[in-house]
């Protein structure tokens, strides 16, 4: 039995050997010293090779159209190096975020993606890996990034069939100790900030009140729908720009957060607290009550920013077409929920249109428009997520850890995330 265990763990790549060894010895503790001594006696060359070969962290260049972020910035690459990890960076990976190859001091610059995937044990990405990229990853590799399994089930199948270990960063549980790993929150903060700037840029008037020789200019009225991370950042930014800001969310608990930023909370009398920090779906009666109150505020607004989105599900329709047609001429709607179809009925994802003299813009991949800080925040999220799994340059995930277990998408040829498994079949 002992020799059988040795054969199994010894045949695995370095990155998976330690996880398998830990699994055996966890359930049969007495085997730990025996296996260790036998491996030392029977396979000294393999052990020496493992000591000389720390895991290799691969940072490829993002291939998605318009994606300017990079998964690891130079400062974070140095942090990984201090953990004993060898960092490989594809040439040009940081160009979109204004990080040159030379700025990745201590990292190895690899000329092509194919060469990087052939060497990397642990791959980190912003966008989900494409089918071609998955095909280039070596056996036993691990990949971490935003996987969007609901949008790309075929890619999840490939990860499963190739028996790759994958972590979906959007599945990191929303608990206190995982806040520093939460890529959804960090990137939503970027999107909320940028949304307020997009609105100000498209508005036909000033945001702040101005007193001029020609008289006083009234401040713009801004309504932000959805008081999650993106919505609160949009509120804060619009306030800094001098606008009169109102905020709305179906979760009553957000009132205090909205008001703490100096905005007025719109109370529709509807409260819909859900699980995981998200709102539950409204009943038809609640939707009608919500609409009656919101329509008045939308009609009075110069700018409306919508942020109501739930990962993996269509965005709720909050602003009807006829409501848009009753808005002020020249009013602006920035629909941050466009990735899921939009909160406004007339939103065309990725496009700016004018409907009944109202500007409606549904931007996509907004964090990529601020690549420097979006990349920095994302890289720190990855560092905080992966650091507990790395010990002396070796990959040792604790599968009993809630954060690690909940974030695992595929492992050992299985889809571990239940909703994705049901979707893929």
PLM region spans:
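ADP-ribose/adenylate-binding Rossmann-like module
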Residues: 139-158, 165, 304-348, 352, ...
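Adenosine-phosphate binding glycine-rich loop
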Residues: 170-172, 176-213, 338, 344-425
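An N-terminal-biased, well-structured beta-alpha scaffold segment characteristic
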Residues: 47-158, 162
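Glycine/serine-rich phosphate-binding loop and adjoining beta1-alpha1 elements at the start
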Residues: 62, 131-221
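Glycine-rich phosphate/diphosphate-binding loop of Rossmann-like nucleotide-binding domains
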Residues: 61, 65-82, 86-89, 210-297
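A structured beta-alpha segment of the ubiquitous adenosine-cofactor-binding alpha/beta core
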Residues: 108-118, 128-129, 275-303, 308-321, ...
